[in-house]
């Protein structure tokens, strides 16, 4: 069975940034407020399914979305500009590939790949003289997991997630370099009530926040960082 999908996406963005410290070089002391803006894009996708074996493969494309942000800048050592030029921003296009298939009775294997074109995202307020606040590598994420229905009431899943790292020298505004994660979750149903809980452990890749300038060097050393997240949801059907 083959199906297609499409739709309009609305995206709202606002931001504020303050740069302080030697890692920013001459830009230390700079600050900017970006007022909210709503932009519109689209998504297109297609899916192929074989329900008898719980097979589903889907590909979805998300378009770029353009924004124009009213901007107030200040520093270093200067008064705020109440009516600075607007800052253009384009958020990245992306592609998702998702799949699942039955491998045994009440057991699924699932996974996905996501790519986002973050290397094309540039935020260039006027006072920075054409320099971008962002310098992000393209984003690649791989997910692979197994889900199983243990009874009519309880099902569970475990999955691994990998995000590719890039250059060890990273922006101080995003001081990670790839990551690896493990997620375990389960769902328990009681008549019309569905209880879902999960826990995630993520290990971040080592990175070196860099100084500003034409020849950046490491200004710090971030190693052995991790995070734990816990989620819980209650659903009621009627």
Describe the residue ranges of each PLM region:
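Outer-membrane beta-barrel porins/channels
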Residues: 1-238
């Amino acid at each position: 069975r083959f199906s297609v999908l499409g739709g309009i996406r609305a995206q709202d963005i606002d931001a504020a940034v303050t740069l302080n410290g030697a890692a920013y070089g001459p830009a230390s002391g700079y600050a900017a407020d970006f007022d909210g803006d709503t932009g519109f894009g689209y998504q297109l996708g297609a899916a192929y399914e074989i329900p008898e074996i719980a097979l589903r493969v889907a590909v979805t494309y998300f378009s770029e979305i353009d924004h124009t942000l009213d901007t107030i800048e200040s520093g270093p050592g200067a008064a705020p500009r109440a009516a600075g030029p607007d800052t253009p921003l384009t958020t990245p296009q992306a592609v998702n590939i998702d799949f699942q298939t039955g491998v045994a009775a009440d057991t699924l294997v699932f996974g996905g790949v996501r790519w986002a074109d973050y290397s094309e995202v540039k935020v260039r307020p006027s006072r920075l003289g054409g320099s971008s606040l962002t310098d992000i590598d393209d984003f690649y994420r791989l997910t692979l997991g197994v889900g199983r229905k243990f009874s009519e009431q309880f099902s569970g899943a475990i999955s691994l997630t990998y995000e590719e790292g890039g250059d060890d020298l990273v922006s101080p505004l995003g001081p990670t370099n790839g990551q690896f994660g493990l997620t375990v979750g389960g769902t328990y149903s009681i008549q019309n009530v569905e209880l879902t809980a999960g826990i995630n452990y993520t290990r971040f890749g080592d990175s070196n926040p860099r100084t500003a300038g034409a020849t950046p060097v490491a200004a710090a050393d971030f190693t052995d960082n991790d995070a734990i997240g816990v989620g819980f949801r209650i659903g009621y059907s009627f």
